[in-house]
A protein has these predicted regions:
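Active-site donor/metal-binding and catalytic loop motifs
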Residues: 139-155
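A recurrent flexible, glycine/aromatic-enriched loop bordering the glycosyltransferase active site
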Residues: 57-69, 80-102
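A short, conserved alpha-helix in the catalytic core of glycosyltransferases
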Residues: 109, 118-135
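Conserved donor-nucleotide/metal-binding helix-loop-beta segment in metal-dependent transferases, i.e.
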Residues: 25-53, 57
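Catalytic core of nucleotide-sugar-dependent glycosyltransferases
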Residues: 69-79, 156
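Short beta-strand-to-loop acidic/aromatic patch adjacent to the donor-nucleotide binding site
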Residues: 11-25
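Active-site-proximal specificity loops/subdomain of glycosyltransferases
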Residues: 1-14
């Protein structure tokens, strides 16, 4: 992913890079434009866009997004209790869906990011964005109802 972002951002015609999870069942042709428009309209001054969405399964109407609901949210809340509200922790807590794999950024930002290439991509990338960009240059975009291919959760 890091090589892709740098390769595409070196293209003189490319102004932004947008990436989407490959397992989206409800992908809409509107998603790319929703993600990149805040970056292309210079009046907004946005450098990074992170998606959020409702994680309701279309198969069984069950709420998905277990990793965020059952791990990341409680982990950030526990860290807040242990170390207090620091600026970085508040930043991470400000994202409606921090593990969303859909994000977009400007060519200039892409050239300065150290993009993680393994587990932890989403939080690692948010950390890099925090290191490189003022929070006023970050936006979240609602992509509406979103359904991924799901893995069954079984307790053995």
């Amino acid at each position: 992913m890091g090589r892709l972002a740098r390769h595409r951002s070196c293209d003189e015609k490319s102004e932004v890079v947008a990436l989407f999870d490959a397992d989206i069942r409800t992908f809409s042709p509107l998603y790319p434009s929703r993600m990149i428009l805040p970056l292309l309209d210079e009046s907004y001054g946005i450098s990074y866009v992170k998606a959020f969405y409702s994680r309701l399964s279309l198969e069984n109407n069950q709420l998905q997004g277990r990793a965020t609901r059952l791990f990341v949210g409680p982990l950030l809340a526990s860290l807040e209790q242990l170390v207090g509200k620091g600026p970085f922790l508040q930043y991470l807590q400000s994202f409606r869906y921090p593990l969303a794999g859909e994000f977009a950024f400007t060519k200039d930002l892409a050239m300065n990011l150290r993009i993680p290439c393994d587990w932890g991509l989403e939080i690692g990338l948010l950390s890099e964005v925090y290191r490189n960009v003022r929070t006023s240059k970050i936006a979240q975009v609602d992509l509406g109802l979103f359904d991924h291919k799901h893995k069954n959760f079984m307790i053995k």
